[in-house]
Curated annotation (Swiss-Prot):
The gene is ispG. Its EC number is 1.17.7.3. Its cofactor is [4Fe-4S] cluster. The keyword Ligase does not apply. This is 4-hydroxy-3-methylbut-2-en-1-yl diphosphate synthase (flavodoxin). [4Fe-4S] cluster binds at C305, C308, C351, E358. It comes from Nitrosomonas europaea (strain ATCC 19718 / CIP 103999 / KCTC 2705 / NBRC 14298). The keyword S-adenosyl-L-methionine does not apply.
């Protein structure tokens, strides 16, 4: 680790190309998401994929669980391309993937990657045959595969073998350690078998999903051991994290530790949406984790104080929220026009105690008056006080300052870039 508060250098691994996106191999950590629509409904699935891509998802996974879903995949891909949305699609297969990919070659071709779970491909000889069919299809169409092992669906024969070996050991492992070993063994043995069947090493991504919000330590231990034992690209995600703040905290607690150690090449935050909630929330949370850790930049960061007895007005909170929404909306335009604008930092502070100092540390900062203070708001640009705002249109004037800063500070991209 380079210092006590800087993430370690990234773990070296083999890069895997998924459509136009590189996972691992030194590439930036990839944000991905998954739809919750019925894939057989081409229109609604296309719309949600496009929404997730617009929010910043660089890969989008869709369920392929039936003949109807498999038949719809090529149409979804065509609809997205017609919209100018070229985000790679990942097919999520369980139980019957070997049948669907074989029966619907247009589905196999349209997907950029296949996700398979070795725990539910089948059992015994059937497992071997069906796993082979999946891998042979991937080889035929030159598609990468994520071999995703899940805590809740481990191959029972493999698990029984490991438990028997442990029982005969003079120094047996505890129950959790046995499960850790089973997850890792399943992933590595499946990857080795895939390579034997002809799937190149640079076409394999691994994941070991641990279930439940109280299992972060298990996830950290499993991925730490897996990272030491192989050089495959790794997908991180805490399955069944839950909804709301609990889901966000559970995912962040596990992902942040691993990312800090340099482990992880692509991430998904598996949030359960609130009723009527926005599916794209999981994309934004994943981006915020990476950006807060200094691993990637997606949108300008808006810092704001939490408020206290000095900040009796709620205006600074309203301004902070409106600016945060504004810059995220504007990034749709800015990222196409300006280089590096995602690195811009803003500060909206609520009183004189920390306001001026914190504002000076941001690219653009505003210090709003607290309780009993003169009703004026100094603005700092690149550490220097440039103007003092007052009146009823502070928010509008501050947005104009932000716009002007973007236009003058960041270089315009070439027209054909």
């Amino acid at each position: 680790m380079s210092s006590n508060n800087v993430p370690a250098s990234r773990r070296k691994c083999v890069g895997v190309k998924v459509g136009s996106v590189m996972i691992g191999g030194g590439a930036p950590i990839v944000v991905q998401s998954m739809t919750n629509t019925d894939t057989a409904d081409e229109v609604s699935t296309t719309q949600q994929v496009a929404q997730l891509a617009l929010a910043g998802s660089e890969l989008v996974r869709i369920t392929v669980n039936s003949m109807e879903a498999a038949r719809a995949v090529a149409g979804i891909r065509a609809r997205l391309d017609d919209m100018g949305c070229h985000v790679p699609l990942v097919g999520d297969f369980h139980f019957n993937g070997h049948k669907l990919l074989t029966a619907y070659p247009e589905c196999a071709r349209a997907l950029a990657k296949y996700r398979i779970n070795p725990g539910n491909v089948g059992h015994g000889r059937k497992r071997d045959e069906q796993f082979s069919l999946l891998i042979e299809t991937a080889c035929k169409y030159d598609k990468p595969v994520r071999i995703g092992v899940n805590w809740g669906s481990l191959d029972p024969e493999m698990l029984a073998r490991i438990m028997d070996e442990n029982a005969r050991s003079p120094d047996p492992l505890g129950a959790s350690q046995v499960m850790h070993k089973a997850l890792i063994t399943s992933a590595l043995e499946s990857a080795a078998r895939a390579e034997e069947l002809g799937l190149a090493r640079d076409h394999i991504v691994l994941s070991c999903k641990v279930s439940g919000v109280a299992r972060q330590q298990d996830m950290i231990a499993v991925y730490g051991a897996l990272a030491e034992q192989c050089d495959y690209a790794l997908h991180l995600g805490l399955t069944e994290a839950g909804m709301g703040s609990k889901g966000i905290v559970a995912s962040t607690a596990a992902l942040a530790v691993l990312l800090f150690k340099g482990i992880g090449d692509t991430i998904r935050v598996s949030l359960t949406p609130e009723p009527g909630g926005d599916r794209a929330r999981e994309v934004i949370v994943a981006q915020e984790i990476l950006q807060t850790m200094g691993l990637r930049a997606f949108v300008p960061l808006v810092a704001a104080c939490p408020g206290c007895g000095r900040t009796t007005s709620t205006y600074f909170q309203e301004l902070a929220e409106s600016i945060q929404i504004y810059v995220r909306e504007q990034m749709v335009i800015w990222r196409e026009q300006y280089e590096g604008v995602e690195n811009m930092s803003l500060a909206v502070m609520g009183c004189v105690v920390n306001g001026p100092g914190e504002s000076k540390h941001a690219d653009i900062g505003i210090s709003l008056p607290g309780s009993g203070e003169t009703p004026v708001a100094p603005v700092f640009v690149d550490g220097q006080k440039t103007v003092t705002l007052k009146g009823d249109n502070i928010a509008g004037e501050f947005r104009m300052i932000v716009d002007e800063y973007v236009r003058t500070k960041y270089r315009k991209k070439a027209a054909n870039a």
